[in-house]
Amino acid sequence: MARSPVEPPASQPAKRAAWLRAELERANYAYYVLDQPDLPDAEYDRLFVELQRIEAEHPDLVTPDSPTQRVGGEAASGFTPVVHDKPMLSLNNGFADEDVIAFDKRVADGLDKATDLAGTVTEPVEYACELKFDGLAISLRYENGRFVQASTRGDGTTGEDVTENIRTIRAIPLTLKGKRIPRMLDVRGEVLMFKRDFARLNERQRAAGQREFANPRNAAAGSLRQLDSKITASRPLSFFAYGIGVLDGADMPDTHSGLLDWYETLGLPVNRERAVVRGAAGLLAFFHSVGERRESLPYDIDGVVYKVNRRDEQDRLGFVSRAPRFALAHKFPAQEALTKLIAIDVQVGRTGAITPVARLEPVFVGGATVTNATLHNEDEVRRKDIRIGDTVIVRRAGDVIPEVVSAVLDRRPADAQEFVMPTECPECGSRIERLPDEAIARCTGGLFCPAQRKQALWHFAQRRALDIDGLGEKIIDQLVEQNLVRTPADLFNLGFSTLVGLDRFAEKSARNLIDSLEKAKHTTLARFIYALGIRHVGESTAKDLAKHFGSLDPIMDAPIDALLEVNDVGPIVAESIHQFFAEEHNRTVIEQLRARGKVTWPEGPPAPRAPQGVLAGKTVVLTGTLPTLTREAAKEMLEAAGAKVAGSVSKKTDYVVAGADAGSKLAKAEELGIPVLDEAGMHTLLEGHAR
């Protein structure tokens, strides 16, 4: 990016402002992308202040991509969810050289690379190697070269809009440069804080009498999630681009290394510590080379990342679960320290898992002060022979989650105490049970336990469960934290005045949620069973239970032998179901749902008897929008009553159930003389099956 040859005089404010913007952006590019600063800080500040003055005097000269627009705007009330057009996937991890060798072998096998008789790869795969930054993954969207949106990774599918905060980061260009500008480009990368900037930030915090940050990652995370972008603007954040989401209007580079080279031509900051290597030997050489220089790098990293370089080979390998087969994160060994174990408590997770947690004398390890560490499970405590009072080795696994590695036996005091797993949940008093062949003990009060409350409510409301539209995690958080909802049954007591009192919950949202709760009262037995959140009981098992028993009470009272007769239900699943219904707290909530909530479903006779009633063997077609039921809920109710639900109308169709905005299916039914029912008429047919 060349320096502007002619400096316009102050008497020409439009030209002067344009020149100042170009000069400041050129200086940013030289500093952050080229790492070759050529403008002293004082001179940069002088030009910046001059541009601010001109734009204040001539507001019509302000442009969206002006460097002055990075300083932050009004405080936001919250972060808006953003659904990623292309998921931001996580990577599989490797911790040892053997993991890398195995990864290379899997990749070579997947690409049908040549091997010798001993199985050694003789046609090495080409990889792109990069650093794994210890920061926050984000996605930047550019449209026609202009920055328009930034979002966090979130759960990989949905993140949060942090556009105004990202706009304040000088390393990120607001306008792309170069000739190959795409119509749309999602840049994936990492927001981080350099070590020198972190040290200066903590100096400022100390001088202001404010709390210091534990490490650069925490500082970056806290800065990026500020509701007031002015605070973010005051924090020294940086950025490196390393991946891509959506691309439209330009050709995708053939290689990953080519992508990063292209990014540099667009003015995006890309880390120079990268290489293209061949085979496992090349991967390990890069890893160990970086490891030797890790402490001298100007930023924190927790490993390196390997990616198959050729794009066509990446496509051939594809993905498994939520991670690509063509990439691996190779983590550095975690850092360790010695401290004293003061006590062992148990923690109840969102799914009821009981985890022993070590309470420690504070120790600084892996860049953070650690006072608690996981002991994983009861078996691990026994295997490692860890006792209260021991001196223990603490490790930050993956540099994030502290764990107790082992006890230092020659320092064990005479009064060291063995850990005993409690028999009752510390949160709700329900029984703690451990299934055969499982390492994790669990609280059995799934519908009642406060620690599991949010997870139970969230699962209960899922689309494949009772499908309560509008009951998202943030609303559940408020309902639980304000003690408005303790169990799923309490949802059906929520009133309009209660809902509109929630933070950022308008009248329309309240009415929609109440309508959704009303619709949720009419469900199917299979959906209801699935909604209970019984461990090991997914949609398929819930349907098998409903089909086998026909109604809920026989399932609740079934002994393990009877449960084992259900299709695909083995000993572990049967024991889990039996334990769930044996817990009186769960039975109480179920009765409240049936009585207070009036949740109903069509019931049928137990298998193997054929479905009875007017819909047995009948073919029904659904069309339009029903007043209280979703299409999926209506379909399941009809199928539970023995009907076959078809997607198109023909002479073999017995009934058409039509709602609002019914289209060609309704017209064809009328043409063929097929009986047309509304939702009320459908319920009339189902009366012989309803509770």
Swiss-Prot record:
Active site positions, chain numbering: K132 (n6-amp-lysine intermediate)
GO cellular component: cytosol
Record-linked InterPro entries: BRCT_dom, BRCT_dom_sf, DisA/LigA_HHH, DNA_ligase, DNA_ligase_AS, DNA_ligase_CS, DNAligase_adenylation, DNAligase_N
Annotated NCBIfam families: dnlj, PRK07956.1
Gene Ontology MF terms: DNA binding; DNA ligase (NAD+) activity; metal ion binding
Binding site for NAD(+): D41, A42, E43, Y44, D45, S90, L91, E130, R153, E190, K307, K331
Cofactor(s) recorded in Swiss-Prot or TrEMBL: Mg(2+); Mn(2+)
Catalysed reactions, semicolon-separated: NAD(+) + (deoxyribonucleotide)n-3'-hydroxyl + 5'-phospho-(deoxyribonucleotide)m = (deoxyribonucleotide)n+m + AMP + beta-nicotinamide D-nucleotide
Known EC number: 6.5.1.2
UniProt keyword annotations, A-Z: DNA damage, DNA repair, DNA replication, Ligase, Magnesium, Manganese, Metal-binding, NAD, Zinc
Family statement: Belongs to the NAD-dependent DNA ligase family. LigA subfamily.
GO biological process, one term: DNA replication
Organism annotation: Burkholderia pseudomallei (strain K96243)
Binding positions (Zn(2+)): C425, C428, C443, C449
Function according to Swiss-Prot or TrEMBL: DNA ligase that catalyzes the formation of phosphodiester linkages between 5'-phosphoryl and 3'-hydroxyl groups in double-stranded DNA using NAD as a coenzyme and as the energy source for the reaction. It is essential for DNA replication and repair of damaged DNA.
BRCT domain boundaries: 610-691
Protein name, as recorded: DNA ligase
Top-level enzyme category: ligase
